[in-house]
Amino acid sequence: MSEIESLDPRDVWHFFHEITQVPRPSKREEKIIAYLTDFARSRNLEYRKDSTGNVVIRKAASPGMENRPAVILQSHMDMVCEKNGDVNFNFETDPIRTRIEEGWVKATGTTLGADCGIGMAAALAVLNADDVPHGPLECLFTVDEETGLTGAFGLGEGML
C-alpha cells in the first residue's frame, strides 16, 4: 500500500494512487481509458467510449431509487505534465511518485496530476461504493481538457 492510500476517505485515495500510476498526458490518454474501461468491466458496470475517447460509466439506481433523478459526475483524464529541470521523467511511461509532506499530498519532481485526478478518484469511489443508496449514476471522463477541451467539445451524441 502506498503512503497516500492510508488517507481518508480510503477509497478516494486508493483510486487516486492507482490513477497516478497510469501515464495520462494530454492527447495520449489510451492507458487511462483502458484503466477506466477495465474498472467498469470488473464491476459489471455499463460503459461507453465515444470516437473522441471520452468514457461514461453508468451505475444503475439502488432498489427503490430508480425514479430519482440521475446524477452526473464529470472529470477529465489528462494532466498538466511539468517536471523539475533536474528530474529524469517521461510522462508517457512513468508513474507519478507521490508522498505526504507536512500534511499535503505532493509529487516528487513533477506535477501531481490532482487536476483532475482527484475528481476521477472521487467518481470511481462513488461507483465502487455499495453502502450508499443512490439514484442512477453516470460518470463522464473527458479527454484533452488541458490543451483544448477536445473531449468536452467533441462529446458524442447520446453519451449522457
Model regions and ranges:
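Acidic/His- and Gly-rich active-site-bordering loop/insert found
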Residues: 3-103
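Short, flexible active-site loop motifs that bind/organize anionic cofactors or intermediates
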Residues: 2, 23, 109, 113
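Conserved strand-to-helix beginnings and helix N-cap segments that scaffold or border functional pockets
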Residues: 30, 152-153
